[in-house]
Amino acid sequence: MLKSVNLKRAFRLTLMTYKLDFKKSALKEWKKLGSTLQQQFKKKLIERLEDPHVPASKLSGADNMYKIKLRQSGYRLVYKVEDDVVIVTVLAVGKRERSDVYRKAMKRSDV
């Protein structure tokens, strides 16, 4: 199930090329993050909504799935790009430890 996010309100921007959606479980993970981590991810998401296809961030073995890394904190955000409907869907947010965040994202992308 997808949860739509109002970007104008969330990021106070008026020009976006892609719409941002969260899987319900990813939104739950997002809300558990501290405000500092959320702000860091928001800044990167704003850039990615302009151009979500970043070759260096593409997940190997997954079509149209990319990651955003916060190196210092060890957190990752995994999203899927749907070009046909111009949507970026956040699939998972979490620590990189044992690659759990990537496994969650792969499962959620199939649902």
In which residue ranges do the predicted regions lie?
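A short, surface-exposed loop/turn module that caps and links secondary-structure elements
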Residues: I46-L70
